[in-house]
Regions:
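Local beta-strand N-terminus motif with an aromatic residue
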Residues: 5, 57, 250-251
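N-terminal Rossmann-like FAD-binding beta1-loop-alpha1 element of flavoenzymes
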Residues: 5-32
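Conserved Rossmann-like nucleotide-cofactor binding loop
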Residues: 15, 38, 260
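Glycine-rich FAD pyrophosphate-binding loop
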Residues: 24-47
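Dinucleotide-binding Rossmann-like beta1-alpha1 core, especially the glycine-rich loop
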Residues: 49-124, 167-174
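Mid-domain catalytic core of redox enzymes
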Residues: 229-332
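Conserved small/polar residues in nucleotide/adenosyl-binding loops
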Residues: 333-340
Length: 340
């Protein structure tokens, strides 16, 4: 069967749905092709015996008014959580971010962190920083960097900090990795009573339906066709084929799929482009979902694990995000690991 459509969008995750929503608001006809049986992508979820698990770790802390309006239209009611993330380091619970909440550590370790923090060079131009390893040492000193973010980077990103660039860190004000003052580091060594310095002051989550519920307003009145896995794209003839044998003629094509996968679908791709695609790196996440018969779990929405002998990089508790995620009287945890 051959179908004519002015704009085809590949993938019904948040990116593909966002593109369809924006175009339809401007009066443009769209068709979204999704290989799965429902929308959501990594923002989707699945349910086993009454336990609902998001496909990855999600909260909303968006500041854009339009995004928040769309999310609220979809979710209806939300829980508004104050971030209470913690860190697990050698059996010790440390408030997040660790760099200005070191109170539970031994005095010897705290002294080493403060000493290195005070001895950081202050006259280095940011343009001289060549990688993430250098950035971490410059921000926090050698001791803290080597015991906390550098080993965590290897666990989470499955690569060395020296192999990562730093543009993703953004500005000091917008960075997800808090950069405390000397006074904040010292205060966090002397007391556990410290203010919340997480990069977002509020984390929002739907009361019902999991994180996917935020996206439900995006799918209203959209032409989304499921079980449509794209296998080939003929750019010259503007023709796309799916594994079911359907063909779609397109004027414009928008893809939210991984770039190397799109390259495989295209015809007559130059060798240098194929080679460039093969050199691209990505990190894949794996989650272990656990439903528990008890509510007796740590009271933290999520926590990071710095110890290299413990495989998961972080753990989070969907039942604390919303009790709708679990049967009554139960709880759940998800352990997150990464693999190249």
């Amino acid at each position: 069967m051959k179908m004519n459509n002015p704009v085809l969008i590949l993938g019904a995750g948040i990116s593909g749905l966002g593109a369809a929503y924006k175009l339809s608001c401007n009066g443009q006809q769209t068709v979204v092709l999704e290989k799965d049986t429902t929308y959501g992508g990594l923002c989707g979820n699945f349910t086993i015996d009454g336990f609902r698990f998001d496909r990855f770790v999600h909260f909303s802390f968006a500041k854009d008014e339009q995004v928040n309006r769309i999310f609220m239209d979809g979710a209806g009611e939300v829980f508004r959580h104050v971030p209470n993330a913690y860190n697990l380091y050698q059996g010790i619970w440390i408030k997040h971010p660790a760099q200005n909440n070191l109170y539970p550590l031994s005095q010897k370790m705290k002294d080493a962190v403060v000493r290195d923090f005070l001895s950081r060079p202050t006259d280095i131009d940011s343009s001289q920083i060549q990688n993430y390893d250098q950035w971490l040492r410059l921000q926090f000193g050698h001791f803290f960097a080597e015991h906390f973010p550098i080993p965590y980077t290897k666990k989470y990103w499955m690569t060395e900090a020296k192999d990562l660039e730093t543009r993703w860190m953004g500005s000091r004000e917008g960075s997800r990795l808090y950069q405390p003052s000397v006074e904040e580091v010292i205060q966090g060594c002397n007391t556990s009573e410290t203010p919340v310095t997480y990069y977002s002051k509020e984390m929002r989550y739907p009361r019902k339906g999991g994180f996917k519920q935020f996206l439900s307003a995006l799918v209203e009145n959209q032409d989304i066709r499921y079980n449509q896995q794209v296998i080939s794209i003929d750019v010259e003839n503007r023709l796309l084929r799916t594994s079911k044998g359907d063909e779609y003629q397109f004027d414009r094509l928008i893809s939210s799929l991984p770039l190397p996968e799109v390259i495989k679908m295209l015809k007559n791709v130059p060798v240098d482009v194929c080679n460039a695609a093969a050199r691209l790196h990505c990190t894949c996440g794996y989650q272990i979902s656990v439903g528990l018969k008890t509510k007796n779990i740590p009271p933290y929405l999520w926590w990071y694990i710095y110890d290299e002998d413990i495989l998961p990089a972080r753990v989070y508790s969907p039942s604390l995000k919303s009790p709708d995620n679990v049967p009554e009287g139960r709880s759940e945890e998800r352990r997150v690991g990464k693999e190249c």
